[in-house]
């Protein structure tokens, strides 16, 4: 029997994601597969903040190269890591049903962000999170926090940080306990990254099983995530810039919330659009236009200096 080769990063969370797709392939598509671990640029360079490494696709480039060579059949990504413009010949075969989209506060000593003392050190990999933390608490010190989920938790528990911010979806997938205090921010309190909580399966568009993999697609999640990706694409952005965007469906209505600003919490733009689902992509363009008129491009250029 033919076996598909799934390319995956080697972290515990990435392997959970790859195994999740492997199990669904067997159950829903009657297809066997095996996992090949691939080290990406983002995995190799751990002593620098992600925004300082430079370039897009820090966690996807090497996987995409193997897809183009035909060395693997599909690559499983956290959708938030997937660049909005694909290498020629590649595309997403499916976007899975979204898990919890929220960001989560974790601390050993303090119950929430507002209870942290002045000058407390908060660890995060994300300029988007730093920006929204600083928007609420200018007196906090946000610092880069690299490594897998367990490594980050150990740094919290040994006192390197007073608090850290992680994605709730990853914590739930790994069934993470640890940290005395754990509190998820609402989407309004901290707008997530594009695609947060969803997995994206990338393949060659002409792969013979590309259509088959669409059985794993979740229509509602895919629709919302594509709206978010369209917004990021319009700003020529990626996952290492201070932008949050979240689209949600409520019956036939869609709501798109977005935030953009400097990592220090200054010059922040926050806007939202609501309307009929049939006008969803028009609403994205209207929101983009409002952001651009408010100086979004100039703010993003300044953000490159941080």
Predicted feature residues:
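Small-molecule-sensing regulatory modules
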Residues: 2-46, 52, 135-306
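Extracytoplasmic loops/domains of multi-pass membrane proteins
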Residues: 66-68, 82, 87
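Short, structured active-site "lid" loops
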Residues: 48-73
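Short glycine-rich anion-binding loops that position phosphate/pyrophosphate groups of nucleotides
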Residues: 79-82, 169-171
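Short, Asp-centered acidic motifs that coordinate Mg2+ and/or phosphate
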Residues: 72-76, 162-163
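A conserved helix-loop-strand patch within extracytoplasmic ligand-binding domains
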Residues: 79-80, 88-140
């Amino acid at each position: 029997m033919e076996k598909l080769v799934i390319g995956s990063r080697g972290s515990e969370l990435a392997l959970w994601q790859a195994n999740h797709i492997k199990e669904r392939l067997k159950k829903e598509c009657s297809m066997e597969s095996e996992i090949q671990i691939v080290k990406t640029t983002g995995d190799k360079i751990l002593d620098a903040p992600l925004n300082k490494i430079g370039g897009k696709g820090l966690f996807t480039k090497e996987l995409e190269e193997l897809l183009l060579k035909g060395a693997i059949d599909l690559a499983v990504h956290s959708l938030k890591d997937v660049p909005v413009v694909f290498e020629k010949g590649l595309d997403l075969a499916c976007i899975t049903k979204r898990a919890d989209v929220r960001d989560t506060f974790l601390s050993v000593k303090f119950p929430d962000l507002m209870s942290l003392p002045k000058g407390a050190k908060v660890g995060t990999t994300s300029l988007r999170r730093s920006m929204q933390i600083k928007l609420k608490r200018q007196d906090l010190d946000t610092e880069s926090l690299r490594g897998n989920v367990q490594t980050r938790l150990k740094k919290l528990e040994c006192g390197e940080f007073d608090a850290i911010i992680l994605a709730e979806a990853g914590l739930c997938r790994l069934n993470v306990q640890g940290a005395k205090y754990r509190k998820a921010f609402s989407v309004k309190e901290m707008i997530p990254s594009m695609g947060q909580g969803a997995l994206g399966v990338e393949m060659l568009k002409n792969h013979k099983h590309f259509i088959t993999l669409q059985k794993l697609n979740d229509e509602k999640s895919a629709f919302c995530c594509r709206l978010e990706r369209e917004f990021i694409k319009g700003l020529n952005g990626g996952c290492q810039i201070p932008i949050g965007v979240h689209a949600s469906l409520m019956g036939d209505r869609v709501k798109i919330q977005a935030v953009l600003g400097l990592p220090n919490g200054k010059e922040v733009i926050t806007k939202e659009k609501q309307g009929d689902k049939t006008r969803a992509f028009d609403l994205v363009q209207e929101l983009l236009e409002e952001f651009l008129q408010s100086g979004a491009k100039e703010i993003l250029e300044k953000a490159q200096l941080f």
